[in-house]
Curated annotation (Swiss-Prot):
Cofactor: [4Fe-4S] cluster
Lineage per the UniProt record: Bacteria, Pseudomonadati, Pseudomonadota, Gammaproteobacteria, Enterobacterales
Protein name per Swiss-Prot or TrEMBL: Fe/S biogenesis protein NfuA
Cofactor comment text: Binds 1 [4Fe-4S] cluster per subunit. The cluster is presumably bound at the interface of two monomers.
Assembly information from the UniProt record: Homodimer.
InterPro entries listed in its UniProt record: Fe/S_biogenesis_protein_NfuA, FeS_biogenesis, FSCA_dom_sf, HesB-like_dom_sf, NIF_FeS_clus_asmbl_NifU_C
GO biological process, one term: protein maturation
Function: Involved in iron-sulfur cluster biogenesis. Binds a 4Fe-4S cluster, can transfer this cluster to apoproteins, and thereby intervenes in the maturation of Fe/S proteins. Could also act as a scaffold/chaperone for damaged Fe/S proteins.
Family membership noted in the UniProt record: Belongs to the NfuA family.
Gene Ontology MF annotations: 4 iron, 4 sulfur cluster binding; iron ion binding
Keyword Lipid metabolism: no
Residue sites binding [4Fe-4S] cluster per the record: 149, 152
Length: 191
């Protein structure tokens, strides 16, 4: 799941020596599986260990990972690098935001990945989001808008000129995109 280099283990062991006895480290992801995911490392005193945590035992320490973060920390690496400018702890977690789907994955998964990794981060600037509801047998992607996009007067332009063009360019097997949302204009609407 997580690889911690020898130099990082030595760095953590040095820090842990100044903490309450039995304190280890916790590796976690805030907002896992989203474009806003952030990884972190913190102290984990003995009374903060949960029964559902995964304990990863290393030579010099134990790293605890909570149940929600665990799948997003696959292939994560923690290293402690020293160069002429100083020392730096690095944490690389390539799956924290969302796992990249393979090119031969089912169309539904590939479309969902595009929505979550490229389209929704753009819509989030307006407080909006879009969800894939289904892909019909005749190749139509059925979407539902939420947040600031619901009731927005520009939603048709966003759908046709933005989302549909991008999706049809990326997935030639799609024939079009349709909006399933029952739009209700309100204070939540962006325009």
């Amino acid at each position: 799941m997580i690889r911690i280099s020898d130099s990082a283990q030595a760095h953590f062991a040095k820090l842990l020596a100044n903490q309450e006895e039995g304190t280890q480290i916790r590796v976690f992801v805030i907002n896992p599986g989203t474009p806003n995911a952030e990884c972190g490392v913190s102290y984990c005193p003995p009374d903060a260990v949960e029964a559902s945590d995964t304990a990863l035992k290393f030579e010099l320490l134990t790293a605890y990972v909570d149940e929600l973060s665990a799948p997003y920390l696959d292939d994560a690496e923690i290293d402690f690098v020293t160069d002429q400018l100083g020392s730096q702890l690095t944490l690389k977690a390539p799956n924290a935001k969302m796992r990249k789907v393979s090119d031969d994955a089912p169309l539904m998964e590939r479309v969902e990945y595009l929505l979550q990794s490229q389209i929704n981060p753009q819509l989030a600037g307006h407080g909006g989001r879009v969800t894939l509801m289904e892909i019909t047998e005749d190749g139509l992607a059925i979407l539902q808008f939420g947040g600031g996009c619901n009731g927005c007067s520009m939603v048709d332009v966003t759908l046709k000129e933005g989302i549909e063009k991008q999706m049809l360019n990326e997935f030639p097997e799609l024939k079009g995109v349709r909006d399933l949302t029952e739009h209700q204009r309100g204070e939540h609407s962006y325009y």
